[in-house]
Every structure is written in C-alpha cells, then in structure tokens.
Amino acid sequence: LFVGLTSAKYHDVCQLPRDPGPCRAYIPLYYFNSRTCLCEKFVYGGCQGNANRFDTVEDCRRRCGGGDLCSLPRDSGPCEAAIPRWWYNKRTNRCQRFTYGGCEGNANNFKTLDECRFQCRKRSTY
C-alpha cells in the first residue's frame, strides 16, 4: 500500500500547483499548468516548493505533456504495477486500454474511458 501511495503521488506531480517555495533565490524553471495543459515558466525560490518543477521546457513536456497531451505516445512507465488505464491513440483516433506501471509515464493516461474521450475528443466542424 505504501508503494502504491508513493507511486500515485509521483504520477500526480503534473497536477500539483505552481509552488515557488518560501526562499528568495531567483531560479527560472518550468512547471506544468494542469489547467492549460502547458509547460510554463516560473521563478523558483530555491527551497521547499513541490516536485512540479523542471529545469527545461523539454523535461516538463516529456514528463507531463504540453499543449496536446492526446498526441503523446502510450507510456506504461518503468514501474511494475498493473493498473488498468486508458490512453488516446492519435493514429486510430480512439481511446484504448493499456497497463500502467504506477509511476512516471506521461499525461496521456486516463483512469476512465469517459475521461479519455472528454480530454481527447475530436473537434469536428459538422
């Protein structure tokens, strides 16, 4: 159970709010804004804060996505849990089941089919 909680917390790093921490250093970093689904710049104070901070925009996008999370590849992550999840396959334009390992991975990872469909539904003009 403890490992599961740790993995779940690590997976949710992209959902954490921007947190510069209480210190007053000036360290420009990036965080994932879960409302806009974009990696954005912020100034980290140098201590405390949370794990939603990345040295480069590329690191942020690799971990959390950026802009179009539905275009990210399926990524089970390196851990070995067997958690049923859904991912959006842009090639087939469908949400598909996959087995999530419980840590890391990317933002194209949904708990339910409905959540996947809601996030990645096609924007049609008809």
UniProtKB/Swiss-Prot annotation:
Residues 14-64, 70-120 form the BPTI/Kunitz inhibitor domain. It comes from the Eukaryota. Component of the acid-soluble and acid-insoluble organic matrix of calcified shell layers (at protein level). It is found in: Secreted. Its main location: secreted. The keyword Repeat applies. Keywords: Disulfide bond, Protease inhibitor, Repeat, Secreted, Serine protease inhibitor. Disulfide bonds join 14-64, 23-47, 39-60, 70-120, 79-103, 95-116. One of its GO terms (cellular component) is extracellular space. InterPro entries: Kunitz_BPTI (IPR002223), Kunitz_BPTI_sf (IPR036880), Prtase_inh_Kunz-CS (IPR020901), TFPI/VKTCI-like (IPR050098). The keyword Chaperone does not apply. Signal peptide: none annotated. GO terms for molecular function: serine-type endopeptidase inhibitor activity. SMART domains: KU. Serine protease inhibitor. This is BPTI/Kunitz domain-containing protein.
